[in-house]
Amino acid sequence: MSKNILYITFVDFNEQKSGSSVRPKKIYDAFLEEGYKITLLTGLQNRKLERWKNSLEFYKSIKKGNFDFCYVEPPAGPIFNLCDHLLLLYISKIKKIPIGIFYRDAYWKFADWYQLKGIKRFIINTMHKFDWMIIKKTCKKVYFPTKTMGDLFDFKEKEALPPGCELLSVDDNINKNVEIVYVGGVSEEYGGKLLLETLDKVNKDKKMILHLVCRKEEVGKLGEYKNKPWLNIYHASGNELKEVYSKANLAIIPRKIDFYMDFSMPVKLFEYISYELPIIATRCKEVAKFIEDNNIGLVTDDNIESLYEALMKVNVDNILEYNKNVKIAKKNNTWNERVKQISRLSNI
């Protein structure tokens, strides 16, 4: 294998603001670490002229070269520009290069979660269906965040390709008490209300600090809890999170259990593992399975009583036991391991 590959992304690597934009760069860096020579297409699709120019240059590179496979990290929504569909057809049908694509989201399939209505929804759904038709015609394998999500789609060759961990250097936590970190939205579906109500109840029986990282505009949703002595609020991202994580010895994912949450796999799960934090999570199917399979924490129902019971049971000693398994899970689920999985495309 020459280790020459094509990599198509829809982000600007200099503007990484969300999980969907961070992931393509992590994959890219892991490919480089594994010794791959990458012909790369980047650029935001809403910058149409720039995208078409980049696609033309990418096409010229493909014409001249030989490549083992092509990997695609698509946008969160549908593909806007026809040049990208044409590239996939050219790579697959003319150059005969095997293509694998990561299909990140299925919001558009589910009315309860999909916020668009009326003609906008019809147009976006039509675009998603057109994308899927092109994918079925051009791709040898489709990767999904989880197996459960993959089961919703009809495709012969499919695999789960969840986010990865970073091999960060982490100091051993010396907390004498349980201190929890939560990074994310505080809306009800993401478990904000459940988390705050439960921690308030716990703190009537024993001290337990919550380090909560959220956006500034969400502070109003914290209501009566924002001034509680057990709650520390931060607005941090990127490297700023390291200091917050260092304060905690336990992480939490308190999502409301529903059909969509059952098949999603949050990036934060693997970020928590990267910082070697055991995890308490509600019983959303794929998250719960990962935690239980790796024995890296506790799983509860999405109600106050169940979460309260788990938090009352947890202590520094069993956190240290879970921490040993977290370190193993971290090594087994790096971005480099994800890239090794993708590299099997060359054998198809």
Predicted feature descriptions by range:
Residues L86-I94, K109, G118-V142:
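Membrane-proximal helix-turn-helix segments that form the acceptor-binding/catalytic region
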Residues I124, K129-D171, Y182:
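Donor nucleotide-sugar binding/catalytic pocket of nucleotide-sugar-dependent glycosyltransferases
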Residues F69-C70, Y90-D112:
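Active-site proximal beta-strand in glycosyltransferases
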Residues K60-H85, K96-G100, K141:
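Short N-terminal targeting/anchoring amphipathic segment
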Residues R23-I27, E166-L168, K176-G223, Y234-L241:
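Conserved catalytic-core segment of nucleotide-activated headgroup transferases in glycan assembly
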Residues Y190, L241-V244, A251-E271, A281-K289:
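Nucleotide-sugar-dependent
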Residues G19, D302-I304, N315-N347:
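A charged, aromatic-enriched C-terminal amphipathic alpha-helix characteristic of glycosyltransferases
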